[in-house]
Amino acid sequence: MSLISRLRAVVAGDDYLDGDYDDLDYDAGEHDDSPQAMASASSALAPLDAANPFDMDQGFSGSNVIGMPGISSSAAEVSLMEPRSFDEMPRAIQALRERKTVILNLTMMEPDQAQRAVDFVAGGTFAIDGHQERVGESIFLFAPSCVTVTNSAHEEASTPTVVTKDVEQASAEASVAPAPAWAAPGAAAL
């Protein structure tokens, strides 16, 4: 094929740019399309099909949704722990990883060990994007990210008047600009 005929074929949209496809010698051989040949071929493949655990025909339910581990459709589970030593804290982290809410009652621990335990579990809670809340004296609530924690007692204690007063004080302080530290006392008058 010459260059001009190839260009014409491209412009015309001819799918076969080369006429060489017809020149290839393929030995087509004989194909046996009889039902007996098809049955023997399928019986030869039958042991392979039975051994295939990923066969789509076996137990296909029509859904390809896979549940996340630790999430159940039942009610949320809360784990109450009253540890006596810091060695019990990995159980609290494991419960959080299983998406369980953990309430730690640290009244049985020494104050320095209790502080260490709270820091440890708070770090684990932060790592899984969870929430923490102090419930009472030495009692803490740690929740995974799938649980929403609201504190209604804290919301009732704050009043809008206090918030408004804080906003007014902040805006009054912001209107007075402090003098820069590099400016000399006499230079401000110039």
From Swiss-Prot:
Coiled-coil segments: none
Keywords for the protein's UniProt record, in alphabetical order: Cell cycle, Cell division, Cytoplasm, Septation
Biological process annotations from GO: division septum assembly; FtsZ-dependent cytokinesis
Record has Hydrolase as a keyword: no
Keyword Cell division belongs to the record: yes
One of the record's GO cellular component terms: cytoplasm
Superkingdom in the source lineage: Bacteria
Pfam families recorded: SepF (PF04472)
Subcellular location: Cytoplasm
Protein task: Cell division protein that is part of the divisome complex and is recruited early to the Z-ring. Probably stimulates Z-ring formation, perhaps through the cross-linking of FtsZ protofilaments. Its function overlaps with FtsA.
Record family assignment: Belongs to the SepF family.
UniProt subunit comment: Homodimer. Interacts with FtsZ.
Protein name: Cell division protein SepF
Organism whose genome encodes this protein: Synechococcus sp. (strain WH7803)
Lineage: Bacteria, Bacillati, Cyanobacteriota, Cyanophyceae, Synechococcales
